Amino acid sequence: MAIVKCKPTSAGRRHVVKVVNTELHKGKPFAALLDTKSKTGGRNNLGRITTRHIGGGHKQHYRLIDFKRNKLDIPAVVERLEYDPNRSANIALVLYKDGERRYILAPKGLVAGDTIQAGASAPIKVGNSLPMRNIPVGSTVHNVELKPGKGGQIARSAGAYVQIIAREGNYVTLRLRSGEMRKVLAECSATIGEVGNSEHMLRVLGKAGANRWRGIRPTVRGTAMNPVDHPHGGGEGRNFGKHPVTPWGVQTKGKKTRHNKRTDKFIVRRRGK
């Protein structure tokens, strides 16, 4: 994998920094594992905007990723690594011994030809998935389940990982990248290693159009709007003279947004503390 800075042949290329991975498959994806992906433009079924800054972008197919890793004790060979436009991580096409193919998240260090396996008896090896009760304390894992059998929900983006720091009874304690420490059932499965493509954060798009290709529309500051459009709008100069709020008047700095009290007991330490 290489970090390539483009030559300044135009204003739009001057600041572009690309992440080039020569190991990625250059052909088409595996058709049987593709699904349609329709554009919403950020609108709901009433045609009202529910998520701002969404619209346009290149047409894409969704890749069906196996987050559950529920083909147990059947070895699989990594056929190739592929680019996935729907996520920051790369994906790997694996062929199981029984002939079935699936996509999985490509962990760091996994290459074509490697053998992986899922199940309680799987060895501690990058790409293998097993219950966290069987993973040594101190190990780095990704694609971590919150409920047994539901599929991985934590640490799925490029370069993400979670560290197992303790095991007590039916629970393991995890340290997340945010600094949060939380308990999860030891029966939940996780995949050994960290998610690959960690250089993703180093890329520089270089121009506004590159975001438009990705379906991301501009974000306009509230203070640049009129009073009818935003609480920060209007007035002389750039000062809006009040506490920062969202377009709907909700405080935007320091206000807690978590409401799930039922699972508060599993959080040992909050993030950022």
Curated annotation (Swiss-Prot):
Cellular component GO terms, alphabetical: large ribosomal subunit
Keywords: Ribonucleoprotein, Ribosomal protein, RNA-binding, rRNA-binding
Biased composition (Basic residues): 253-273
Pfam families cross-referenced by the UniProt entry: Ribosomal_L2 (PF00181), Ribosomal_L2_C (PF03947)
InterPro entries linked to this entry: NA-bd_OB-fold (IPR012340), Rib_uL2_dom2 (IPR014722), Ribosomal_uL2 (IPR002171), Ribosomal_uL2_bac/org-type (IPR005880), Ribosomal_uL2_C (IPR022669), Ribosomal_uL2_CS (IPR022671), Ribosomal_uL2_dom3 (IPR014726), Ribosomal_uL2_RNA-bd_dom (IPR022666)
Alphabetized GO MF terms: rRNA binding; structural constituent of ribosome; transferase activity
Similarity remark: Belongs to the universal ribosomal protein uL2 family.
Chain's role: One of the primary rRNA binding proteins. Required for association of the 30S and 50S subunits to form the 70S ribosome, for tRNA binding and peptide bond formation. It has been suggested to have peptidyltransferase activity; this is somewhat controversial. Makes several contacts with the 16S rRNA in the 70S ribosome.
Species this chain originates from: Glaesserella parasuis serovar 5 (strain SH0165)
Taxon lineage: Bacteria, Pseudomonadati, Pseudomonadota, Gammaproteobacteria, Pasteurellales
Protein's UniProt name: Large ribosomal subunit protein uL2
Disordered: annotated segments: 221-273
Gene name of this polypeptide: rplB
Domain of life: Bacteria
Assembly information from the UniProt record: Part of the 50S ribosomal subunit. Forms a bridge to the 30S subunit in the 70S ribosome.
Gene Ontology biological process: cytoplasmic translation
